[in-house]
Amino acid sequence: MTKKPVPDASIAETAVIEAPAGTGATVSRRSFLKFAGASGLASATGALAAGAARADVTHTTPPDGSPEQIHLTWGDDPTSEVVVSWASLAASANPRVLVGADHGRRDTVHAVQRTYTDGLTGVVVFTYHARLSGLKPATTYTYEVTADNDSHAGSPFSSSFTTAPRGRAPFRFTSYGDLATPNTGWVLSSPQSRFAVDAVERFQPLFHLLNGDLCYANLNPAHQTDVWRDFANNNQTSSTRRPWMPCPGNHEIEFYNGPQGLDSYLTRYTLPDNGSRFSGRWYSFQVSSVLFISLDADDVVYQDAAAFVAGPMPLVPAASTGHAPIAPGSSFYVRGYSNGEQTRWLEQTLRRAADDRDIDWIVVQMHQDALSSSKTGNGSDKGIREAWLPLFDQYGVDLVVCGHDHDYERSYPVRGCNRHAGIDAKTGEAVDTLQPRPVPHTHANPDATTFDTSHGTIHLILGGGGTSAPLDVYGVDMGNGNPQAQVFTKPNRPVAGTTAGTFVRPTADALEDAIWSAQRDTGTGYGIAVFDVDPGEHGGKTTMTMNYYHAPGADQTPNPDYELFETVTLEKRRR
């Protein structure tokens, strides 16, 4: 998408279904899932008009500089730096954070203001970022967030956080993706997202990994900023107490919001520096002996699943934006936007980690999936397999955590691939999907729960945050009964729909036996992974134990009670 004109429909690909705004028409959940599951997205069509159907968004007091949507992220060094970020409904005067160790002296850190104007609605969003530096490792700090025009200045927002330990030390982190908001007036939101945030607090991690598709604002084009607001305010009960480290997903890509559609995401989050011109899109940080690498998979995937106009009406931005209507069939496809810069950065980061004796583990976070056998969701993407899996093999990545498909799936450790093992989904002809190959003998015992990841990488699909569209139905090869995956091996360009003037995006073009799939949760799509890292002793083993908790029955009725589904231990020789 260029800076000025309508997105080029010839290079756009995304699929979506939504009734034109203001018509009073609705799309059933069943129909929505059919389209969202088939193409990995949902759609946006119609004009952005005052009075369009929407969720309740009421402001009972005049907008001022009162802090809200408060969240923490790690700085470049989690042992000594935390960033406090927030938003306000109007510009804040002298926005600041007061911080100090428990019962100690308080320092004032002034925040930097960042704004963006939503490209569809013209709403100006004010955000603030205070970088707290010079902190001590493994230390608890209390802080207050306020401004001169904070209506709660007499009793400002306050919370606390704990910095990461220095050197090898045990710690806990949690992860899931695809969270949404509790406001059921928004497309794909569900009350389960409230319970998902509570689940993080139940397990008290040092930090949380949020694996993309944060709130699905691009599925609510007339109210994108309101959706973001509901999302961030919902998270405050956890994200103000511990860093929430995100990666962008396809639903963070929004029309007219920057070259990759990520202006909202990038304005709201301050993330570790990657030293490139694409700040905030990918990054890394180290806690204890674990290197965490966060990637933007939209740069390499074949599937187009970002902002999309299904038609038959164009998407018409608010007049104040000065932006042209977006034609039916347009989608925001960004594959290759970094021209290989992200992949080169990834290789350099992995190479340095391989030479660093203080790093035992490498965990990669991204949104889309290299290994997924979801039938009603998106499936796997050959683009990731081509660009990044060889690097994961070469440099010994231990674990990959993703979202995208709204379910839980765990792979065996994989290393290398089988060539020409897939088939065309329509013709049955052979297709090279680069089928990931399980490490020999790891799948001989399907009940095994301990794996040496020095021999291969385990992939986890953790897409059951809080979205209203669980996708816990998995593919089966009807010929042999084995798990089966659908795979995108080429772009899924929009094609004409069955209704005149509408467009859809095709599902994945290839199929393969999912010989790499070790565990799938057919009971519910919702859950949270809890990881406990034990650095071990010199000369011995180090372990990372994953307990996956799911919410039985939440597909039908939101459920706050998460129960243990499985426990898996990753182990390897400590450096």
Predicted regions and their residues:
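N-terminal secretory signal peptides
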Residues: 1-27, 45, 54
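Metal-dependent phosphoesterase/phosphodiesterase active-site architecture
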Residues: 18, 56-96, 104-106, 113-115, ...
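N-terminal twin-arginine translocation
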Residues: 25-34, 41-60
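Ligand-binding face of N-terminal immunoglobulin V-set domains in extracellular IgSF glycoproteins
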Residues: 126-134
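Active-site glycine-centered loops adjacent to acidic/histidine catalytic or metal-binding residues
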Residues: 178, 212-213, 249-250, 367, ...
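Mature extracellular/periplasmic domains of secretome proteins
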Residues: 196-204, 232-237, 348-352, 387-391
